[in-house]
Design a protein with these regions (language model features):
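Iron-sulfur (Fe-S) cluster-binding modules
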Residues: 1, 7, 226, 231, ...
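Ferredoxin-reductase
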Residues: 2-89, 93, 109, 143-145, ...
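Ligand-binding loop in jelly-roll beta-barrel domains
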Residues: 59-63, 104-107, 346-356
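Small/polar loops that bind or transfer phosphate-bearing groups
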Residues: 68, 114-115, 143, 211-212, ...
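FNR/FR-type flavoprotein reductase catalytic core
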Residues: 79-262, 267
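Local cysteine-cluster metal-coordination motifs and their immediate loop/turn environment
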Residues: 122, 294, 298-322, 333-348
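Phosphate-handling active-site elements
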Residues: 131-138, 319-328
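Redox cofactor-anchoring modules in respiratory/redox and cofactor-processing assemblies
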Residues: 235-295, 311-316, 344-356
Length: 356
Protein backbone atom coordinates (compact mmCIF):
# COMPACT_ATOMS: atom_id res chain seq x y z
CA UNK A 1 0.00 0.00 0.00
CA UNK A 2 1.60 3.20 -1.19
CA UNK A 3 2.16 6.27 0.96
CA UNK A 4 2.20 9.83 -0.33
CA UNK A 5 2.94 13.29 1.01
CA UNK A 6 0.89 15.81 -0.91
CA UNK A 7 0.73 19.58 -0.60
CA UNK A 8 -2.41 21.69 -0.65
CA UNK A 9 -3.11 23.21 -4.06
CA UNK A 10 -6.36 25.01 -3.23
CA UNK A 11 -9.45 24.82 -1.04
CA UNK A 12 -12.98 25.30 -2.39
CA UNK A 13 -15.91 25.89 -0.06
CA UNK A 14 -18.82 23.85 -1.42
CA UNK A 15 -21.37 24.59 1.34
CA UNK A 16 -21.27 26.08 4.83
CA UNK A 17 -19.99 22.77 6.23
CA UNK A 18 -18.26 21.19 3.22
CA UNK A 19 -14.92 21.85 1.53
CA UNK A 20 -13.05 20.29 -1.38
CA UNK A 21 -9.27 20.00 -1.04
CA UNK A 22 -7.27 19.89 -4.26
CA UNK A 23 -3.82 18.36 -3.83
CA UNK A 24 -0.57 19.13 -5.61
CA UNK A 25 0.50 15.57 -6.41
CA UNK A 26 2.71 16.18 -9.44
CA UNK A 27 5.82 14.84 -7.68
CA UNK A 28 3.95 11.79 -6.31
CA UNK A 29 1.26 10.81 -8.75
CA UNK A 30 -1.34 8.24 -7.79
CA UNK A 31 -3.13 5.80 -10.07
CA UNK A 32 -6.75 5.42 -9.00
CA UNK A 33 -10.22 4.65 -10.33
CA UNK A 34 -13.46 6.66 -10.02
CA UNK A 35 -15.16 5.65 -6.77
CA UNK A 36 -12.02 4.81 -4.76
CA UNK A 37 -10.94 6.51 -1.54
CA UNK A 38 -7.84 7.59 0.41
CA UNK A 39 -6.77 7.39 4.03
CA UNK A 40 -5.76 10.74 5.50
CA UNK A 41 -3.57 10.86 8.61
CA UNK A 42 -3.49 14.04 10.71
CA UNK A 43 -2.10 14.94 14.11
CA UNK A 44 -4.86 16.95 15.77
CA UNK A 45 -3.98 18.45 19.14
CA UNK A 46 -1.52 15.65 19.82
CA UNK A 47 -3.87 12.86 18.76
CA UNK A 48 -3.03 10.89 15.61
CA UNK A 49 -6.20 10.29 13.60
CA UNK A 50 -6.75 8.34 10.39
CA UNK A 51 -9.93 8.71 8.34
CA UNK A 52 -11.09 7.64 4.89
CA UNK A 53 -12.32 10.10 2.25
CA UNK A 54 -13.53 9.36 -1.26
CA UNK A 55 -11.88 11.02 -4.22
CA UNK A 56 -14.29 13.43 -5.89
CA UNK A 57 -11.86 14.01 -8.78
CA UNK A 58 -11.20 11.73 -11.75
CA UNK A 59 -7.82 10.32 -12.83
CA UNK A 60 -7.49 12.75 -15.76
CA UNK A 61 -7.84 15.81 -13.49
CA UNK A 62 -4.65 17.77 -12.90
CA UNK A 63 -5.15 17.75 -9.14
CA UNK A 64 -6.66 14.87 -7.15
CA UNK A 65 -9.33 16.04 -4.72
CA UNK A 66 -11.39 14.93 -1.76
CA UNK A 67 -14.60 16.53 -0.52
CA UNK A 68 -15.11 16.65 3.25
CA UNK A 69 -18.39 17.39 5.02
CA UNK A 70 -18.48 18.22 8.71
CA UNK A 71 -19.89 15.27 10.66
CA UNK A 72 -21.46 15.83 14.06
CA UNK A 73 -18.89 14.70 16.61
CA UNK A 74 -16.33 14.07 13.88
CA UNK A 75 -12.92 15.28 15.05
CA UNK A 76 -11.15 15.10 11.72
CA UNK A 77 -13.97 16.28 9.47
CA UNK A 78 -14.56 19.32 11.69
CA UNK A 79 -10.85 20.07 11.83
CA UNK A 80 -10.47 19.86 8.05
CA UNK A 81 -13.51 22.05 7.36
CA UNK A 82 -12.28 24.69 9.83
CA UNK A 83 -8.52 24.54 9.24
CA UNK A 84 -7.87 23.07 5.78
CA UNK A 85 -6.35 26.34 4.58
CA UNK A 86 -3.68 26.05 7.30
CA UNK A 87 -2.67 22.48 6.44
CA UNK A 88 0.32 22.57 4.08
CA UNK A 89 1.07 18.86 3.73
CA UNK A 90 -1.05 15.72 3.96
CA UNK A 91 0.01 12.16 4.82
CA UNK A 92 -1.95 9.87 2.51
CA UNK A 93 -2.20 6.16 1.77
CA UNK A 94 -4.22 4.54 -0.96
CA UNK A 95 -6.07 4.21 -3.12
CA UNK A 96 -8.54 1.76 -1.58
CA UNK A 97 -11.92 0.33 -2.45
CA UNK A 98 -13.72 -1.88 -4.92
CA UNK A 99 -16.70 0.46 -5.30
CA UNK A 100 -15.75 1.51 -8.81
CA UNK A 101 -17.57 2.33 -12.01
CA UNK A 102 -17.54 -0.34 -14.70
CA UNK A 103 -16.67 1.81 -17.70
CA UNK A 104 -17.87 -0.79 -20.20
CA UNK A 105 -21.30 -0.77 -18.59
CA UNK A 106 -21.38 3.03 -18.53
CA UNK A 107 -20.55 3.12 -22.25
CA UNK A 108 -23.35 0.73 -23.18
CA UNK A 109 -26.13 1.24 -20.62
CA UNK A 110 -27.70 3.90 -18.47
CA UNK A 111 -26.17 4.34 -15.03
CA UNK A 112 -28.19 5.50 -12.02
CA UNK A 113 -26.37 7.10 -9.08
CA UNK A 114 -28.22 7.28 -5.75
CA UNK A 115 -26.66 9.62 -3.19
CA UNK A 116 -27.25 11.21 0.17
CA UNK A 117 -25.21 14.01 1.77
CA UNK A 118 -21.46 13.58 1.33
CA UNK A 119 -22.10 10.22 -0.33
CA UNK A 120 -22.13 12.26 -3.52
CA UNK A 121 -18.29 12.37 -3.51
CA UNK A 122 -17.45 8.97 -5.09
CA UNK A 123 -20.56 9.17 -7.28
CA UNK A 124 -19.51 12.60 -8.56
CA UNK A 125 -16.18 11.09 -9.59
CA UNK A 126 -18.05 8.32 -11.43
CA UNK A 127 -20.37 10.85 -13.03
CA UNK A 128 -17.51 12.96 -14.38
CA UNK A 129 -15.81 9.88 -15.81
CA UNK A 130 -18.83 8.72 -17.82
CA UNK A 131 -18.34 11.32 -20.57
CA UNK A 132 -20.40 11.33 -23.74
CA UNK A 133 -22.84 8.47 -24.06
CA UNK A 134 -26.18 7.88 -25.71
CA UNK A 135 -27.58 6.91 -22.30
CA UNK A 136 -27.96 9.96 -20.05
CA UNK A 137 -26.99 9.09 -16.46
CA UNK A 138 -29.52 9.73 -13.70
CA UNK A 139 -28.65 11.12 -10.27
CA UNK A 140 -31.11 10.61 -7.41
CA UNK A 141 -29.89 12.81 -4.56
CA UNK A 142 -31.28 13.47 -1.07
CA UNK A 143 -30.15 16.69 0.60
CA UNK A 144 -31.51 19.25 3.07
CA UNK A 145 -31.84 22.16 0.64
CA UNK A 146 -30.27 23.51 -2.57
CA UNK A 147 -27.96 25.68 -0.45
CA UNK A 148 -26.68 22.62 1.40
CA UNK A 149 -26.32 20.44 -1.68
CA UNK A 150 -22.70 19.60 -2.44
CA UNK A 151 -21.68 20.42 -6.05
CA UNK A 152 -25.03 22.21 -6.61
CA UNK A 153 -23.70 24.63 -9.25
CA UNK A 154 -21.78 21.96 -11.15
CA UNK A 155 -24.73 19.58 -11.12
CA UNK A 156 -27.08 22.34 -12.26
CA UNK A 157 -24.76 23.09 -15.19
CA UNK A 158 -24.63 19.44 -16.23
CA UNK A 159 -28.41 19.24 -16.03
CA UNK A 160 -28.77 22.38 -18.16
CA UNK A 161 -26.43 20.88 -20.76
CA UNK A 162 -28.70 17.80 -20.84
CA UNK A 163 -25.77 15.52 -19.99
CA UNK A 164 -27.35 14.53 -16.67
CA UNK A 165 -30.86 13.93 -15.33
CA UNK A 166 -31.41 14.69 -11.63
CA UNK A 167 -34.17 14.02 -9.14
CA UNK A 168 -33.71 15.70 -5.75
CA UNK A 169 -35.34 15.13 -2.39
CA UNK A 170 -35.01 18.21 -0.15
CA UNK A 171 -35.74 17.40 3.48
CA UNK A 172 -35.74 20.91 5.01
CA UNK A 173 -39.28 21.59 6.33
CA UNK A 174 -39.37 25.04 4.74
CA UNK A 175 -38.50 23.80 1.24
CA UNK A 176 -41.24 24.34 -1.36
CA UNK A 177 -41.00 23.70 -5.10
CA UNK A 178 -43.27 23.19 -8.08
CA UNK A 179 -40.62 21.33 -10.09
CA UNK A 180 -41.47 17.67 -10.67
CA UNK A 181 -37.93 16.48 -9.88
CA UNK A 182 -37.53 18.63 -6.75
CA UNK A 183 -39.42 16.56 -4.18
CA UNK A 184 -40.18 18.15 -0.78
CA UNK A 185 -39.54 15.86 2.18
CA UNK A 186 -37.79 12.54 2.48
CA UNK A 187 -37.89 9.86 -0.15
CA UNK A 188 -40.28 6.99 0.51
CA UNK A 189 -40.29 3.55 -1.09
CA UNK A 190 -43.35 4.51 -3.12
CA UNK A 191 -41.83 7.77 -4.38
CA UNK A 192 -38.48 6.16 -5.21
CA UNK A 193 -40.07 3.37 -7.20
CA UNK A 194 -42.22 5.89 -9.05
CA UNK A 195 -39.18 8.06 -9.89
CA UNK A 196 -37.15 5.10 -11.14
CA UNK A 197 -39.98 3.76 -13.29
CA UNK A 198 -40.53 7.23 -14.73
CA UNK A 199 -36.91 8.16 -15.46
CA UNK A 200 -35.20 4.83 -16.22
CA UNK A 201 -36.02 3.27 -19.58
CA UNK A 202 -34.81 -0.29 -18.95
CA UNK A 203 -34.78 -0.67 -15.19
CA UNK A 204 -33.64 -4.31 -15.14
CA UNK A 205 -30.69 -3.72 -17.47
CA UNK A 206 -29.48 -0.61 -15.65
CA UNK A 207 -26.71 -0.58 -13.03
CA UNK A 208 -27.24 1.34 -9.78
CA UNK A 209 -24.50 2.83 -7.59
CA UNK A 210 -25.46 3.81 -4.02
CA UNK A 211 -23.56 5.81 -1.38
CA UNK A 212 -24.70 7.84 1.63
CA UNK A 213 -26.02 7.42 5.18
CA UNK A 214 -26.80 3.81 6.07
CA UNK A 215 -30.56 4.26 6.53
CA UNK A 216 -30.91 6.04 3.19
CA UNK A 217 -28.79 3.45 1.40
CA UNK A 218 -30.96 0.68 2.79
CA UNK A 219 -34.05 2.56 1.59
CA UNK A 220 -32.57 2.91 -1.90
CA UNK A 221 -31.72 -0.78 -1.96
CA UNK A 222 -35.16 -1.82 -0.75
CA UNK A 223 -36.76 0.27 -3.49
CA UNK A 224 -34.60 -1.42 -6.14
CA UNK A 225 -35.21 -4.92 -4.77
CA UNK A 226 -38.93 -4.16 -4.80
CA UNK A 227 -38.64 -3.39 -8.52
CA UNK A 228 -36.99 -6.80 -9.07
CA UNK A 229 -33.63 -5.26 -9.97
CA UNK A 230 -30.99 -8.05 -10.13
CA UNK A 231 -28.67 -8.05 -7.10
CA UNK A 232 -25.62 -8.00 -9.38
CA UNK A 233 -26.78 -4.65 -10.79
CA UNK A 234 -26.79 -2.98 -7.36
CA UNK A 235 -23.44 -1.59 -6.16
CA UNK A 236 -23.07 -0.02 -2.71
CA UNK A 237 -20.46 1.63 -0.50
CA UNK A 238 -21.15 2.23 3.16
CA UNK A 239 -19.26 5.16 4.71
CA UNK A 240 -19.98 3.65 8.12
CA UNK A 241 -20.03 -0.07 7.54
CA UNK A 242 -21.90 -2.23 10.01
CA UNK A 243 -20.03 -4.71 12.21
CA UNK A 244 -19.21 -8.04 10.64
CA UNK A 245 -21.69 -10.84 11.25
CA UNK A 246 -19.84 -13.34 13.44
CA UNK A 247 -22.60 -15.93 13.28
CA UNK A 248 -21.52 -17.10 9.84
CA UNK A 249 -18.40 -18.99 10.85
CA UNK A 250 -17.73 -21.82 13.25
CA UNK A 251 -15.01 -22.03 15.89
CA UNK A 252 -13.88 -24.88 18.11
CA UNK A 253 -14.17 -22.57 21.11
CA UNK A 254 -10.47 -22.75 21.91
CA UNK A 255 -8.09 -19.87 22.54
CA UNK A 256 -5.43 -19.74 19.83
CA UNK A 257 -1.84 -18.56 20.13
CA UNK A 258 -0.62 -16.22 17.39
CA UNK A 259 2.96 -15.16 16.65
CA UNK A 260 3.20 -11.44 15.82
CA UNK A 261 6.30 -9.83 14.32
CA UNK A 262 6.24 -6.07 14.91
CA UNK A 263 8.54 -3.09 15.29
CA UNK A 264 9.08 -0.85 18.30
CA UNK A 265 10.93 2.47 18.55
CA UNK A 266 13.24 3.36 21.42
CA UNK A 267 15.41 6.41 22.16
CA UNK A 268 19.13 5.70 22.57
CA UNK A 269 21.38 8.72 23.16
CA UNK A 270 18.59 10.99 21.86
CA UNK A 271 18.32 8.99 18.65
CA UNK A 272 15.42 6.77 17.60
CA UNK A 273 16.33 3.11 17.26
CA UNK A 274 13.85 0.68 15.70
CA UNK A 275 13.83 -2.91 16.89
CA UNK A 276 12.15 -5.98 15.44
CA UNK A 277 10.12 -7.79 18.08
CA UNK A 278 8.34 -11.13 18.16
CA UNK A 279 5.41 -11.64 20.52
CA UNK A 280 3.29 -14.70 21.28
CA UNK A 281 -0.24 -13.58 22.08
CA UNK A 282 -3.44 -15.36 23.03
CA UNK A 283 -6.55 -14.72 20.94
CA UNK A 284 -9.91 -15.69 22.39
CA UNK A 285 -12.64 -17.34 20.28
CA UNK A 286 -14.38 -14.78 18.05
CA UNK A 287 -11.89 -12.09 19.08
CA UNK A 288 -10.34 -10.09 16.21
CA UNK A 289 -6.56 -10.01 16.04
CA UNK A 290 -6.52 -6.21 16.30
CA UNK A 291 -8.25 -6.29 19.68
CA UNK A 292 -5.97 -9.05 20.96
CA UNK A 293 -2.83 -7.20 19.84
CA UNK A 294 -3.87 -4.00 21.59
CA UNK A 295 -4.72 -5.99 24.73
CA UNK A 296 -1.15 -7.32 24.69
CA UNK A 297 0.31 -3.82 24.30
CA UNK A 298 1.28 -4.06 20.63
CA UNK A 299 1.04 -0.69 18.89
CA UNK A 300 -1.16 -1.05 15.79
CA UNK A 301 -2.45 1.78 13.61
CA UNK A 302 -6.21 1.47 13.11
CA UNK A 303 -9.23 3.57 12.27
CA UNK A 304 -12.59 2.19 11.11
CA UNK A 305 -12.62 -1.25 12.83
CA UNK A 306 -14.94 -2.62 10.14
CA UNK A 307 -12.69 -3.49 7.21
CA UNK A 308 -13.30 -0.43 5.07
CA UNK A 309 -10.26 1.81 5.58
CA UNK A 310 -7.34 -0.63 5.24
CA UNK A 311 -5.26 1.03 7.97
CA UNK A 312 -4.69 -2.07 10.13
CA UNK A 313 -3.24 -4.27 7.42
CA UNK A 314 -0.60 -6.92 8.02
CA UNK A 315 0.88 -9.92 6.23
CA UNK A 316 -0.22 -13.42 7.26
CA UNK A 317 2.58 -15.90 6.61
CA UNK A 318 1.05 -19.10 8.04
CA UNK A 319 -2.20 -20.40 9.45
CA UNK A 320 -5.88 -19.95 8.68
CA UNK A 321 -8.07 -16.98 9.57
CA UNK A 322 -11.65 -15.95 8.91
CA UNK A 323 -11.90 -12.44 7.38
CA UNK A 324 -15.61 -11.57 6.88
CA UNK A 325 -15.02 -8.05 5.53
CA UNK A 326 -12.14 -6.92 3.35
CA UNK A 327 -13.57 -4.00 1.36
CA UNK A 328 -10.24 -2.14 1.44
CA UNK A 329 -8.23 -4.97 -0.13
CA UNK A 330 -8.05 -5.65 -3.86
CA UNK A 331 -7.90 -9.33 -4.88
CA UNK A 332 -4.15 -9.23 -5.52
CA UNK A 333 -3.47 -8.11 -1.94
CA UNK A 334 -5.60 -10.90 -0.51
CA UNK A 335 -3.77 -13.39 -2.73
CA UNK A 336 -0.46 -12.05 -1.38
CA UNK A 337 -1.51 -12.82 2.20
CA UNK A 338 -2.44 -9.31 3.29
CA UNK A 339 -5.13 -9.26 5.98
CA UNK A 340 -7.07 -6.62 7.90
CA UNK A 341 -6.46 -7.20 11.59
CA UNK A 342 -9.81 -5.77 12.67
CA UNK A 343 -11.48 -8.48 10.58
CA UNK A 344 -9.05 -11.36 11.21
CA UNK A 345 -10.28 -14.23 13.40
CA UNK A 346 -7.72 -17.06 13.85
CA UNK A 347 -9.15 -20.52 13.18
CA UNK A 348 -5.95 -22.50 13.75
CA UNK A 349 -3.10 -22.42 16.25
CA UNK A 350 -0.34 -21.80 13.70
CA UNK A 351 -1.19 -18.24 12.63
CA UNK A 352 1.77 -15.89 12.16
CA UNK A 353 1.41 -12.25 11.08
CA UNK A 354 3.89 -9.48 10.42
CA UNK A 355 3.18 -5.77 10.87
CA UNK A 356 4.82 -3.56 8.29
Amino acid sequence: MKKYTWRTHKIVKETEDTVTIYFDAIAQKMTYLPGQYLNIRLNINGELLIRSYSLSSIPSDSYPAITVKRVEGGKMSSYIVDHAANIETWDITGPFGNFILDQKIADQQQVVLLAGGSGISPLFSMLKSIGSTKHTPLLIYSSKSPEETIFWNLLTSLEAERTLDICYSFTAPEFVSTKMNHIPGRFSLLVLRSVIKRLVAAINDTHYYICGPVALMDLYRDALIGLKIPEENIHMEYFNATSADLANFETDGNTNEVIVTHYEDSYVDDEIQTYECTSLIEVKPRQPLLEAMKTHGINVASSCNNGTCGTCWAVKTTGTIHMPRHDALPPQDIAAGIVLLCQSYPLTGDVCVTLQ
